[in-house]
A protein has these predicted regions:
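Phosphate/NTP-binding elements of NTP-utilizing enzymes
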Residues: 2-149
């Protein structure tokens, strides 16, 4: 599988949100604004404690895209992250402090049905379990009821 330019995908996603090509809600627009502002802050504000690691983001996105769908019409095919998914993964894993500690340790992502949230959550969970370098990492998933699980 060829390497994609995830940072370029993130920037195009931001542009699409800002110009209205992608219909976005208030919080999605604010997340884009924060991301773009923080990219500028890392360059201009010496008190800003975070930097964006394209290498780290690429590592996580590549890890997820090397996983395969396990059932349905896409079974045995690689995951391909949608631009919004690259934006989410990039924000969660790309920002770090000078010690390499992630800026964000919690994320709340609201996604409607049939839009790839289970596959994204599985990819992030697997990465956190075995790719993040945390000793004794554990990943839990929960659901509101048995059918949802």
């Amino acid at each position: 599988m060829s390497e994609r330019n995830y940072l370029e995908i993130m920037h195009q996603y931001c542009k699409d949100v800002q110009t209205g090509v992608r219909i976005a809600g208030k919080f999605e627009k604010l997340a884009v604004k924060r991301f773009l502002n923080d990219l500028k802050r890392q360059e201009n504000d010496h008190d800003f404690p975070y930097s964006f690691s394209e290498e780290r983001m690429n590592h996580v996105c590549s890890f997820i895209e090397n996983l395969h769908h396990w059932k349905g019409a896409l079974a045995r095919k690689h995951f391909i992250l949608d631009p919004w998914q690259v934006f989410v993964v990039g924000n969660i894993f790309g920002w770090e402090d000078e010690d390499g500690i992630r800026r964000f340790t919690d994320a709340y992502v609201e996604i409607s049905k049939k839009n790839g949230k289970s596959a994204l959550a599985a990819g992030i969970g697997l990465y956190m379990l075995c790719g993040d370098g945390e000793a004794g990492a554990e990943v839990y998933a929960a659901a509101a009821n048995y059918d949802q699980a």
